């Protein structure tokens, strides 16, 4: 372990005097991987996987302009379907550092996923480092990196997070002597991950909030609470997973993946743990921020997790909150919770829009738009929709549209409304991730977030 720490050169880190020996790092090698991905065509055009906060992002685009055509950038130009290669490329850089000759070399075994993208492209990476003069860029931004590291603990409530988790669950039994590191980069957007590097080291690779990047530490508490979710839901895996392991047989018998999970990619107990870690976050913010409208903040993240495939996150979290009020212990609520998941799972069904995801634009009367659903929906007084305009087959604009006084059918399976828009051809979407509003079935399940209708006026 000492070898790992000593070998990594120019690693900016600061220990947190918290309940744990937590270290925040912004390693030179890790930032190199993030910058390379940001410079690819996918990194520049995808709105999620690379965070593009100015002025840092703009400085990267300007500084590395002379090497924009370097062959490495085409070689590692991954797409959304190549997410394992993308995320593996980013995180595997953590196992590398620069040697005395300025060459990136592997320090220890670590491969986040199957593809060994860094190893296979090492020669091109070192050529890119040399021709771009990357190490000078990293050195010149140390003051900025230091500010992110120094402010991270306060911004993300690290001390409070551990204090809460220690209260509701036992400290992980294998924690003694184990080091926990949070590796950060201002460029990480989506695709966070939590990895056990070896038996003595765990590293989280979360994104960081825009306010932290810009140094806005005191304003917008709601935004900070939302940002806290990313690191909290990784840290609490260390508490949730061991408890789940104790109940692994009960989870297998009472948590039917076919009912609760829609293609999340998390098998068996791992899917349950995702549900639980997000529910524990809801417990934390309710207790830590009693004066804030935490139910609204939770609703936003429930929708995010639902889109990941955990289609009943809102119902699951509500039940965890209910049982926690009685038991005040994570361990003790598992038995009643799993009894509930067994009976409730049989009733879970994700509603959809009838004839959704059509391939051609369908003519519609904007004064009387009719949308039908596969099952009865909750009859809301307003509808929140997102419209994407298409001109010559390309998306040109989009807007959020609020419909007042929609007309619902008696059974809740149809709604009629007027759309006041100048768009000729547009895509009608029913899912807006950062809004508490949404289309929910009468059983409380969110409408399939990937449903849309192609319409024409």
Show which residues each predicted segment covers.
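Bacterial Sec-dependent N-terminal signal peptides
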Residues: 1-21
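N-terminal mature-domain "stem" immediately C-terminal to a signal peptide or N-terminal signal-anchor/transmembrane
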Residues: 19-99, 308-314
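Active-site scaffold of zinc-dependent metalloenzymes
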Residues: 106-109, 187, 192-225
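Auxiliary, metal-adjacent structural segments of Zn-dependent hydrolase domains
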Residues: 142-205, 390-393
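Pan-zinc metallopeptidase signature
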Residues: 281, 290-360, 365, 378, ...
